[in-house]
């Protein structure tokens, strides 16, 4: 499917469903361009789409949307498969997905960049300066930089959905959790780091995370399909995730899949954001362009550079600030061919976003691999293979 055809289908699909309250938004994405003009071999890009379609057919996920862009232009926008195992409608270019942990970078990290630019957030300040409730042995030594690099020493997660009943109780449990290691000494990917950091952002912003991001990022950048807590009127455009058998006991459609984020009311720093490939293409293009898009300078170029470089905390970690970078050896969701200066992230529901500033290229892959169950882990191979196929398709990087 061509980019023009995919965009047309998205508009027609939205229009045919009639009005809703609020209306279902139509995302524009970034301008499309012929793949060859951006250095891509169209046949090789088609091969990447063919691989993705075969992965859907083999059960890796019900459906997916792949978006590839370069130089601020969209070279490929390819929906494949269906909405869900139980919903055989074909995926559209504008289908909305639960981003899961892409929330950490698209939402939370972007918010931190804005607050750093404003001089409100200091990366090496102790977390307790902003959240005094963050208490326990050695926690006075935990900094914002530690939270962003997952080196604070916090546990990976807590069963908040089972052990607490309110948002306030959940936040208290997170803030008073004992560290497993001294700050800065070990890397442990932690949802708790993102939940603590969300509290920092909300206090500095003076408003809830979702409102701050809508006002400062998603609104100005024209990302109308990106938000927490999507309204019921959006339901038909959202790809279902899991048939939840442990907490909510229903098929999740438009409800955050992550249990901790659900206990926090659907708005959290670790998960909860919904979006589509078109909207995300705008943020990706902005980040590759030094924080600017069109006439909007959303983030200082120096801030983008700092947040997307490896911090080496602890020594040998691949983490940037919020973002990750490709592994030096072994498996990486980025594949094996993106440059070492690339940055990206994944989401548990089957989403990923990788950006390569050396090639000025991004790869967005949105799937709902947890439908109908999270036991399906075929996405791990698919992510890296798609990334490699897309890089191989860039046969003229000099353009």
Kindly give the residue locations of the regions a language model identified.
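Short, surface-exposed loop or secondary-structure junction motifs
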Residues: 25-28, 84, 137-342
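Structural recognition of the beta-strand scaffold that forms the well-ordered cores
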Residues: 65-67, 146-148, 227, 353-354, ...
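Bacterial N-terminal signal peptides that target proteins for export
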Residues: 1-6
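Acidic/histidine-rich, surface-exposed loop or edge segments in extracytoplasmic proteins
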Residues: 26-36
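Short active-site loop at a secondary-structure junction
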Residues: 36, 54-69, 86-146, 181-193, ...
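Short, conserved catalytic-motif segment at the N-terminal edge
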Residues: 36-99, 120-122, 168-172, 251, ...
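Short, surface-exposed beta-strand/loop micro-motifs that present aromatic residues
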Residues: 342, 349-362
